[in-house]
Amino acid sequence: MPQTIVVKIGTSSLTDPKTGMLALATIGTLVETLTRLKQKGHRVILVSSGAVGVGCGVLKRSERPKKIAEKQAIAAVGQGRLIRLYDDLFTSLQQAIAQVLLTRRDLVDRTSYLTVQEALNAMLDLSVIPIVNENDTVAVDELKFGDNDTLSALVASLVNADWLVLLTDVDRLYSADPRQNPDARPIPLVSSSELFNLQVDAGSSGSQWGTGGMQTKLTAARIATSAGVRTVITQGKTPQNLLKIVAGEDIGTHFEAQPQADNARKRWIAYGLVPQGILTLDDGATQALLKNGRSLLAAGIVAVEGEFTINDPVELRTQTGQAIARGLVNYNHQDIEKIQGQHSTQIRQILGYGSADTVIHRDNLALLIAAEGI
């Protein structure tokens, strides 16, 4: 049965860890494997990191750039070299590809979010393999994905993928970093209920040339599985294992998809938007949201952070700082500060108007964790 498969390969798998030069054997095997998946009738998207790392190799830089403008320039050099290589290799196998460079801004606006979705699906319908990367040359810090793990999960959600496979520099998830802790235990399977409360010592920020790490992959798994996408973390140096994984073999760590995926609009609220502020909730409001699926009332808010206006996205947190949900507000930050802790019937009296009884209606609220996580 044809399936939609999103594959993300990280910089650590695409390049030599010492020199930053391209790992041509790995890339060649990846291209051949993705083409074979296409020949089997599957729809395939590749999310490829490596622009900055490859750019450093081209320019013979020994360290990743720290200045933003320099990084943007080097990314432009590397992206050109990387996509040329992909095009040459896929063309030799008579497989068409398309380059798709995205920024967070493309997903923040609902209209452009849907436009990206339609464009990706059109490419898949044309039997093209889209090759996606963040557009590092124009992305600004406040509107960056931060890493391609998050980007790949959002892409998988956009196209309602069956699989998201994260190719990385370890063969699976461990209870601790196996490169530093000899007692680290492999974790072959994580259920959807376990994932949101999973605590592992997952190391730090990834390779010298990349920005990802195991924590970002766990975040990606949470995003993808909430969209009904089965997610796998596995070794990037053996991309041929993709064929075995899709065929049902237990390779790497598998994260089970949620039995009931969140609807597309709530996924956009939860993960496509960038929160403009934070609302801290009391225990009663936290339980009402997580266990009863209620709207957020002013009475349950104990603190307001940030500056935002009506319909802006905000993050909802417990009093211990745990993020539990995101939503679109019915009032700006100044008005919420005035009505926090107050009964809904008092809103009109306090503000002089009352556009809504709720601060966030449940239709505009998306949970980030399961009720058992509190």
Swiss-Prot record:
Keyword line: Amino-acid biosynthesis, ATP-binding, Cytoplasm, Kinase, Nucleotide-binding, Proline biosynthesis, Transferase
Residues binding ATP: K8, T168, D169, T211, G212, G213, M214, Q215, T216, K217
Location, primary (coarse class): cytoplasm
UniProt xrefs under HAMAP family: ProB
Protein name stated in the entry: Glutamate 5-kinase
Keyword Nuclease among record annotations: no
Family affiliation: Belongs to the glutamate 5-kinase family.
This protein's encoding gene: proB
One Pfam entry name: AA_kinase
Subcellular localization: Cytoplasm
This enzyme's EC code(s): 2.7.2.11
Organism in which the protein naturally occurs: Picosynechococcus sp. (strain ATCC 27264 / PCC 7002 / PR-6) (Agmenellum quadruplicatum)
Catalytic activity: L-glutamate + ATP = L-glutamyl 5-phosphate + ADP
Pathways per UniProt: Amino-acid biosynthesis; L-proline biosynthesis; L-glutamate 5-semialdehyde from L-glutamate: step 1/2
Residue span(s) of domain PUA: 276-354
Residue ranges crossing the lipid bilayer per the database entry: none
A single MF term (Gene Ontology): glutamate 5-kinase activity
